[in-house]
Amino acid sequence: MLKTVRAARRPPLALRLAPTIVPLLMLRFAAAGLAAQSAAVEESRARADVSAVLDALHEAASEADFDGYFSLYAGEAVFLGTDATERWTREAFMDYTRARFETGTGWTYHMLERHVSIAPNGRTAWFDERLENANLGETRGSGVLVLEDGRWKIAQYNLTIPIPNEMAREVARRIRALKGG
C-alpha cells in the first residue's frame, strides 16, 4: 500500500521574510528620524544666521557703518521706507545713506520681537520684526533674505509704522488731505 506523505507546511511568506524585513524597516525609520532631526537642526541654524544678519544690520546702522551696513544687502536689494514714495534700489539707498553716515549719524532701532521663516529649499528666508525707535516709536521691519555664496543677504527690507486700527481712518484722511485729496 502506498503511504501518503504530506509535505510540511511552510510558514507564510511574510513570516519567512520577517527576520530580514523587520531590521531593514527599523533602519529605514531610524534613518528617516535622523534626517528629520538633521533638517530641523539646519533650519534652526539658518534662522539663527538670518537673525544675526538682522542684528548686524541694526548695529551697523546705529554706528553709521556704511560699508558694514551695505555688505549685508544683496546686489539687487530694494529698501522700502515709511513714506509711500520711498522705494530704493541698493544703489539709490546707498546714495541717500552715504551723506548721513559720513556725518557719523545713523539710526537706531531696538528689536522687540522677531519671527524668521526658512523656505523648504533652505536658500530663502523671510522675517518680520517689531522695532523701537526714539523718533518714530514702534515700527515694523519685514523682508526677504537669500543665501548667496553661503552668506545670507537682504534682498528686500520694508520699514513701516504700524497704525492702531482705531486710528487708521483718521490717519488715512490726513494723508489724503496732505496730498490735496
Give the ranges of each region predicted by the language model.
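N-terminal secretory signal peptides that target proteins for export/translocation
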Residues: 1-15
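Bacterial N-terminal signal peptides
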Residues: 16-30
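Short, low-complexity N-terminal intrinsically disordered segments enriched in polar/charged residues
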Residues: 27, 32-75, 123, 166-181
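Surface-exposed, charged secondary-structure patches
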Residues: 42, 49, 79, 92-138
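Hydrophobic pocket/interface hotspot
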Residues: 57, 69-70, 77, 93, ...
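Solvent-exposed loop/turn segments at secondary-structure junctions
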Residues: 76, 84-86, 131-134, 159-162
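Short beta-edge strand/loop motif at the mouth of beta-sheet-based domains
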Residues: 88-90
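Short beta-strand edge/turn micro-motifs at domain boundaries
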Residues: 138-169
